[in-house]
């Protein structure tokens, strides 16, 4: 594992993330900033893609339809529970 200067500073100064190190100390070490960004990007590229994956519209529509069905089912169950708990709401 490659340890960058910002990682060391983050641990020593008890920052919660590397971005905090760049915000606080970035103006003091401007000449090293681009090198640290390159190293961090190289490390991060091993864990995550550089661009988000596209989601097909049919997948989105399917999920929205499922959400609609769940919401509709919830409203039906809610109505049944309310009418069960309040017998005077029953109509013949």
From Swiss-Prot:
Coiled coil residues, start to end: none
Kindly state a single biological-process term from the GO annotations of this entry. viral genome integration into host DNA
Keywords for this entry? DNA integration, DNA recombination, Viral genome integration, Virus entry into host cell
Domain of life where this protein originates: Bacteria
Indicate the family of this protein. Answer: Belongs to the 'phage' integrase family.
Q: What is this protein called?
A: Putative lambdoid prophage defective integrase
The species is Escherichia coli O157:H7
What gene is behind this protein?
intG
């Amino acid at each position: 594992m490659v340890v960058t200067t910002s990682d060391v500073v983050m641990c020593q100064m008890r920052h919660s993330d590397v971005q905090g190190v760049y915000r606080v100390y970035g103006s003091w070490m401007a000449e090293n900033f681009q090198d640290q960004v390159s190293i961090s990007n190289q490390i991060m590229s091993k864990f995550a893609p550089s661009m988000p994956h596209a989601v097909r519209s049919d997948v989105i529509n399917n999920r929205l339809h499922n959400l609609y069905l769940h919401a509709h089912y919830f409203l039906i169950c809610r109505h049944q529970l309310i009418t069960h708990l309040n017998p005077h709401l029953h109509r013949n």
